A protein has these predicted regions:
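N-terminal active-site beta-alpha-beta segment that forms phosphate/nucleotide-binding
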Residues: 25-101
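Cationic, low-complexity basic patches in intrinsically disordered or flexible, solvent-exposed regions
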Residues: 10-11
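A conserved C-terminal secondary-structure "cap"
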Residues: 247-278
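Conserved phosphate- and dinucleotide-binding cores of soluble alpha/beta proteins
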Residues: 6-7, 17, 25, 93-250, ...
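N-terminal leader/transition segments
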Residues: 23-30, 273-278
Length: 278
């Protein structure tokens, strides 16, 4: 039995259990011979970000990361707690899920401060050290475009593991310099000393072309793997700064047949995952 957390309208989180076999999708027609799409490769790559995390709060931002977190929970990371973000009424009624408990919304911040969370955020800009911008494009005093705002990015990046999902890998996103830093990268965390660097961990960056990380001596962004059908040259051309590129770059692992069955037959029957990469 796997557990997920569902946000309620009155700022509570109710815990729901997902029952059933983790290995087979319900009503799936997927066979071992079905080739995975690029979106499905990305779902699995996002799922891998939470491997080994144990009982932490998984907070995916975006459809593909959400599918990845749910896939991880159904397979190799059953201890994950998921914030589904569904608005459901507190009044009695049939919801189709089993409420096993609840957690006050205020306790989410306790979990954040304790490092019991791993968020996968988006990014309008990311530089080579992982400094992230989701606030504005251009000079902050007179920006060309106003975006989400800083939001919880600073607290996320100094308190618990953070990964990023970028559905369209381009030099505009992977920029030489972030116009405004919201989530701090490795260079800024180091400059802050112990308060900034103690719990700072940027796990992976998953894009429509590749998986990247910061496993270098100076924590500069590194190409970890390229997705099937993509080339190293494609990733380099789509990045606005020099990447650390190993001599041998592996191919991102494709979904196993059981994972494809879950994605197609249980988690995303409408096939919305492909639209996020379009």
């Amino acid at each position: 039995m796997n557990v997920s957390l569902v946000f309620k309208e009155q700022h509570q989180i109710h815990i729901h259990a997902h029952r059933g076999s983790a290995g087979m999708a319900e009503g799936s027609g997927v066979t071992d011979g079905c080739a995975a799409t690029r979106a499905e490769v990305c779902v699995v790559a996002c799922a891998e970000a939470w491997r080994g995390d144990g009982a932490v709060l998984a907070s995916p931002m975006g459809l593909v990361p959400t599918l990845g977190a749910k896939l991880a929970q159904l397979t190799f990371s059953p201890g994950l707690l998921l914030t589904d973000g569904e608005a459901t009424l507190l009044a009695p009624g049939e919801t189709g899920t089993i409420a096993e408990g609840w957690l006050p919304y205020r306790s989410v911040f306790t979990m954040v401060a304790a490092g019991l969370r791993h968020v996968m955020m988006g990014a309008a800009q990311l530089d080579r050290f992982g400094n992230q911008n989701i606030s504005c494009i251009g000079d902050w005093s007179r920006p060309k475009a106003q975006l989400l705002g800083v939001r919880g990015a600073p607290g996320n990046t100094i308190n618990h593991p953070v990964s990023y999902w970028v559905p369209r890998h381009s030099p505009r996103v992977f920029a030489e310099r972030a116009d405004m830093v919201c989530g701090i990268g490795y260079d800024r965390a180091a400059a802050l000393g112990r308060p900034g660097a103690r719990f700072h961990e940027l796990r992976v960056v998953v894009t429509n072309l590749a998986v990247l990380d910061f496993a270098t001596a100076d924590h500069r962004m590194r190409l970890r793997s390229v997705h099937p059908g993509a080339r190293v040259a494609d990733v380099i051309a789509a990045t606005g700064f020099p990447l650390a590129v190993p001599a041998e770059v592996p191919v991102t692992r494709p979904p196993a047949p059981e994972e494809l069955a879950l994605i197609r037959g249980r988690l995303d029957l409408a096939g919305l995952r492909d639209r996020e990469l379009a």
